[in-house]
């Protein structure tokens, strides 16, 4: 059983980035649920746990401790960017092993397709808590810029959030070689 830990960024009293009438915490939760549902409905041999399934406050250490204790095989942290840019980028901890880079490559490649027409900002490294304190391969994604109108308009469309979530799931499925269910839901 492959164990996937999905971490929708922010939540509760931490809205994350805010812009164009959107809150990061709401978008990350929607994307995470689409990712979870796609994995569970379409693949066998996979188990999913989420750091939160509603709008509640969860500390960074609670997220990583939960994933470590559960024995997750992969940790995927979903975020929305801010700061006036545009497009998609992904992060891993600096100098990680090839396995984590392969997971990043698989997810990045699928999500970039969901963001067609947007800038691919590249595969990056960062010393983020959720990448540093996890004991399994961990990838953090930044899915568009909430404070850029073009990106925000894209993120306001529920079908696009679904596409992004499903792309995350496809990347994970590809990396782990998950078996498709005979009758996907």
Model regions: which residues?
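Active-site-proximal helix/loop segments of hydrolytic enzymes
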Residues: 2-3, 26-185
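Glycine- and acidic-residue-enriched helix-capping/strand-helix junction motifs
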Residues: 16-30
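Short, surface-exposed beta-strand segments enriched in small/polar/acidic residues
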Residues: 4-16
């Amino acid at each position: 059983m492959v164990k996937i830990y999905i971490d929708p960024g922010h939540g509760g009293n931490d809205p994350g980035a805010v812009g164009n009438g959107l809150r990061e915490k709401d978008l990350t939760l929607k994307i995470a649920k689409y990712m979870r549902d796609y994995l569970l409905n379409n693949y066998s041999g996979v188990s999913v746990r989420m750091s939160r399934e509603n709008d509640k406050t969860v500390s960074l250490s609670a997220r990583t401790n939960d994933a470590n204790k559960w024995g997750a095989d992969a940790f995927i942290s979903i975020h929305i960017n801010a700061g006036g840019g545009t497009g998609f980028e992904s992060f891993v901890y600096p100098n990680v092993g090839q396995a984590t880079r392969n997971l990043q490559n698989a997810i990045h490649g699928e999500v970039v397709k969901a963001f067609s027409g947007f800038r691919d900002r590249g595969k990056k490294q960062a010393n983020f808590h959720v990448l540093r304190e996890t004991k399994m391969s961990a990838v953090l994604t930044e899915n568009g810029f909430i404070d850029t109108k073009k990106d925000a308009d894209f993120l306001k469309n529920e079908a696009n959030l679904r596409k992004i979530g499903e792309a995350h799931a496809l990347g994970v499925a590809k990396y782990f070689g998950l078996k498709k269910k005979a009758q996907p839901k």
